[in-house]
Amino acid sequence: MKKQIDKDYHLHIFHAKQCDPKKCTGKKMARFELARIFDKVQKIPRGSILLDPMAKQALSPADKHEQNITVLDCSWETVEEVFPHLMRLHLQHRALPYLVATNPVNFGRPFKLTSVEAFAAALYILGNKKQAEKILSKFNWGHVFLDMNKEPLEDYSKAKDSNEIIKIQSEYM
C-alpha cells in the first residue's frame, strides 16, 4: 500500500497595501518564500481558491483538488469594499468556518484572522497540517493558533463538504 504524501499548496497573496508593513503576516510569508505577493488582481492564478469572508460556500476537504490558495491582504476595515471587485475574476470564493484569531492585533476575536492564520486554517482543513505548521512556525504566536483551534480544525478537516462544515461550525458558535 502506498503512503499518501501531502502535496504542498501554492499560496498567493493579493496585497492591497493597507496594513502596517511591520505587522503584515503576508509580507513576512513572502520574505520566507512561503507565499507569492501580487499587486495586480489579474496575476492571481485562474481557478484559485480565494479565501473570502463573504463567500456563500465554506471551504471544505471537497476543495482539495485545487492547488492554488489566495488571500486578500487588506485591512478588516475595508474588506467589504475590496472583495466585490474580485467577483468578476475566475476564482473559487470560499469562506473559512468559525475560528478564533491568536495574532497580537485581534487575539481572541472570531473570524478576524491574519493572512497566515487564514492560510494555515485552509491548509489544515484541506489535509496539509505539515504545511500549516510550517508557515505558522515563522511567527512566535503561530503555534497558539493551532492549539487554540485544534478541536474545530480537526472536525472541519473530517467534513465531506461545505454543508457539513456549516453544521460543524454551528456547534462552536
Curated annotation (Swiss-Prot):
The keyword Cytoplasm applies. Disulfide bonds: none annotated. Its EC number is 2.5.1.157. GO terms for cellular component: cytoplasm. The keyword Cytoplasm applies. Its main location: cytoplasm. This is 16S rRNA aminocarboxypropyltransferase. It comes from Methanococcoides burtonii (strain DSM 6242 / NBRC 107633 / OCM 468 / ACE-M).
